[in-house]
């Protein structure tokens, strides 16, 4: 469970920002969104393969 202690005289916006950062680091929302619907293993593999190809293409573009 993610807990954020609100300090004395700290604006709630700042505490909320720290809470959101902690959630992003733990990748809670990403996992919840991915589990919302069932995706077949073949589709997962296809998406991972396309993502790897895309990353490789970007790396080649950066290196020249």
Swiss-Prot record:
Q: Which GO terms describe its molecular function?
A: structural constituent of ribosome
Q: Specify whether Ribosomal protein is a keyword of the entry.
A: yes
What are the record keywords, sorted?
Ribonucleoprotein, Ribosomal protein
Q: Name one GO biological process term.
A: translation
Keyword Ribosomal protein on this protein? Answer: yes
Which GO cellular component terms are attached?
ribonucleoprotein complex; ribosome
Kindly give the HAMAP family that the UniProt entry links to this protein: Ribosomal_bS21
As for family, the record states: Belongs to the bacterial ribosomal protein bS21 family.
What is the recorded name of this protein?
A: Small ribosomal subunit protein bS21
- Gene that codes for this? rpsU
């Amino acid at each position: 469970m993610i807990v954020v202690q609100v300090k004395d005289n700290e604006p709630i916006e700042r505490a909320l920002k720290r809470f959101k950062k902690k959630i992003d680091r733990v990748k809670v929302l990403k996992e919840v969104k991915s589990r919302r619907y069932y995706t077949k293993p073949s589709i997962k593999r296809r998406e991972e393969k396309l993502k790897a190809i895309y990353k490789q293409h970007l790396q080649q573009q950066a290196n020249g």
